[in-house]
Amino acid sequence: MAFNFNWSPLTADANFYTRAQDLLTAALNKSPKPPIIVDDIIVTELNLGSIPPELEILEVGDLAEDRFRGIFKMSYSGDAFLTLKTRVQANPLNTYLLTRPSFASPLPLAAATPLTIPLQITLSDFKLSGFVVLVFSKQKGITVVFRNDPLESLKVSSTFDSIPFVRDFLQKEIEAQLRILFMDELPAIIHRLSLRLWVPEYRDGEQLETQDTASRTEGPGQDPLASPPQDPVDALGNALNESDIASLSLESSVETHSLFSQKNLLRLAALTDSQRTLSLFTPSIREVVYRAWTSPTDSGEATAGVISPASPALSRTHSQVGNISSFPDTASMVSSQTRSTTSTHSFSSYGLNTGSSRSKVHSRKRKKRVVDLRRPKTTDDAASVSDESAFTESTSAPSVYSAPLPIVREQPDDPVTPPLSPETGLHLPPVPERHRLSTSRPGIRRGADAFVQSGESSSSARRRSDVDVDATPRGTMRSHVAMTRCSEKPEPEAPQQLPSTILPFADEKASSNLVDQALVERLAGEIARRMRDEKMPGSSTCTPFWDRLNHDEAPPPAYGH
């Protein structure tokens, strides 16, 4: 089946070209343009040429007097051309800065000056090939749909043809825009043109819409800030009365626009300070305190109320001499006030332990050793021992403050003292008192002498006492305690005799004879301890725990020996 296209009426009708140019201009400016184009794209010239397209019928779906539906294969290589006119930005730095936020740009002055150049582009030598679905109806107009991209090539001629880079850039960008035009915009343009030609109702509706739009745009616009508000204030926030407002000229827009409503300013201030956050839409939650609400003064007062060394909430105020920087924990304060059981004193020791500079694991080991080696008399003493052990890491110093004896002459201002606790006498074996003195005290006496002579601060004295206590041989203490656990009752005279042994260590001077005697007694005690260990390796039934501690230093013998 052959068709003859009468192409001459399209080339001779001037009104057709005018309407087509308007539709093409609207279509080219509808989609977002690249930032290099700073003005509208105007179609100044359109010519379909004298060579018609070639159509090959592939399928006819519907054929009647007032309707037609078919699928065609179209190919076009004619002399049609299209001329566009616009303005472009020649300064690439200005184009780059326009596409970036203002707070992120360096804001150059001379280099960012815009430079717009008029541009004229002519599109010619179109080569099209594709499959077209054509539907015609007198009531609905013409509908053309491309099943594939019909654009094969075209020629772009512009003002910048002498610059190869600009020429290639324009060629690539215009080809991309034309592909979108053929697939999306051109079918809509053809459909509207057909409705104008064959559907009078559509034509009348467009005329009415155009008239309504023109009537709405006529006349001067109304300025909402032309009249002053009901409660005006000046630029400094001072309220203005009616006489001041009357003296102002309504013609001067600068003065009138500076009159802002006080109510609106208060609302804006409330929005800005909403929950003291950057977001104006932060949801409010009941019974919740936001971190932004707490000012530095409030947080400082709250911290000082809990961790101050002079705080009355802490029963042992000198236990925080080493380090005061800890987070405010109200639970530790409450527990230290009302502790009466073993559970409460462990909770308060946790609150104090968080402020120390030592790790929790290290403090927990020391705490366990102190609890295992002692049998506290009262609950308050036990709580004080656990509190002090988390800071001093000493097995003897805390009990001197928690349960002082009237015989001992100690200084109340001294935060740390090296003598051993009187309670340890309850667990010592029934050996003469001089053996206990010789086996476990030389290191402590040397630490006390050095502390009195040097006169250092409390922190340095604490470190020195820790080193001396750790230097005390643990083997002798473990053997004595193991024998004590096996015995039926502790020695009743130990608490009365032990304070007399503390007095020589509190003394500032010691004779050399005592040092020699202590060394001899230490050697004798060591020999006696080894003999007792050899005689009773497995005779006791309550020594597995202490044997395990001793075996940590020396491995046990093989089974069967």
Curated annotation (Swiss-Prot):
Q: How does it sit in the membrane?
A: Multi-pass membrane protein
Task: Describe the location of the SMP-LTD domain by residue ranges.
Answer: 1-195
**Single GO molecular-function term?**
lipid binding
InterPro entries registered for this protein in UniProt? Mdm34 (IPR027536), SMP_LBD (IPR031468)
Give Gene Ontology CC terms. ERMES complex
Annotated compartments? Mitochondrion outer membrane
Keyword vocabulary terms for this entry: Lipid transport, Lipid-binding, Membrane, Mitochondrion, Mitochondrion outer membrane, Transmembrane, Transmembrane beta strand, Transport
Q: Which residues form a coiled coil?
A: none
Gene Ontology biological process terms in this record: mitochondrial genome maintenance; mitochondrion organization; mitochondrion-endoplasmic reticulum membrane tethering; phospholipid transport
Bias type Low complexity, positions:
332-349
Does the keyword field hold Membrane?
yes
Q: Where is this region: Disordered?
A: 208-233, 299-474, 531-561
Bias (Polar residues): 314-329, 386-399
Compositional bias (Basic and acidic residues) at which positions?
370-380
Write out the biased-composition intervals (Basic residues): 359-369
Purpose: Component of the ERMES/MDM complex, which serves as a molecular tether to connect the endoplasmic reticulum (ER) and mitochondria. Components of this complex are involved in the control of mitochondrial shape and protein biogenesis, and function in nonvesicular lipid trafficking between the ER and mitochondria. Mdm34 is required for the interaction of the ER-resident membrane protein mmm1 and the outer mitochondrial membrane-resident beta-barrel protein mdm10.
Q: What assembly does the database describe for this protein?
A: Component of the ER-mitochondria encounter structure (ERMES) or MDM complex, composed of mmm1, mdm10, mdm12 and mdm34.
What does the similarity note say? Belongs to the MDM34 family.
Annotated domain remarks:
Lacks alpha-helical transmembrane segments, suggesting that it resides in the membrane via beta-sheet conformations similar to those predicted for other outer membrane proteins and porin. The SMP-LTD domain is a barrel-like domain that can bind various types of glycerophospholipids in its interior and mediate their transfer between two adjacent bilayers.
Protein name, UniProt field: Mitochondrial distribution and morphology protein 34
Q: Which organism is it from?
A: Emericella nidulans (strain FGSC A4 / ATCC 38163 / CBS 112.46 / NRRL 194 / M139)
| Gene that this polypeptide is encoded by | mdm34
